[in-house]
Amino acid sequence: MLMTALLLAAGCKKDNGGNGTYNGHDYIDLGLSSGTLWATCNVGADNPEDYGDYFAWGETTPKTTYNWSTYMYCNGDYDQLTKYCTQSEFGFNGFTDNLKTLQQSDDAAIANWGEGWRTPTYNEWIELLTKCSHTSTTINGVKGCLFTGRNGNSIFLPAASSLWDDDSRRVGEDGAYWSSSLNKGIPDSAVGFRFILDWNDFDIYNNNNRCSGFSVRAVHTSH
């Protein structure tokens, strides 16, 4: 596939024939009506097929262990949240703040790539899923999901799986990518795009533990 070859040649940190570069990271125009431009690589990656770093939702640096005891915004467990809590029964000492979307200071894309990049919203993942075709494929020996826009341009999301504690045993079998949106009804969870290659399952899931380590694929808006 020609576009796949162009995507891989572009890399992630320099402009050599891709659709564009912002703050040193390449993006692809998939022809989406929102004008959203998707990064060619995961945050922490140098090539489209690299897994990159894993982040808990609302954290901006990778770590070795992902669970509630290491999560920044709780006091040790899922029902002791200290930020992004819409239900008092999930908050530490009944805490709520009604925050439902990542603040800029808690966005891994902004923290690592600078302003102009950010973690996609729920609606932007929906747009990608419904306005682009998607299929499982393998690039340079790495399995993942290829999204192709109506203009013929493509992005590849590697099957980096997710991390709970330090376990990533499903690497190469599934992918897990954060949105910037909280699960408002169950605030210990956040919204993410997930795919399971063997099941041909590609969908948006609301019930992802915020403390889990997911990939982040950044977006850039041109206007």
Region roles according to the model:
Residues K13-D15:
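Bacterial signal peptide processing site
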Residues L8-G11:
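C-terminal motif of bacterial Sec signal peptides marking the signal peptidase cleavage site
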Residues M1-L6:
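Sec-dependent N-terminal signal peptides
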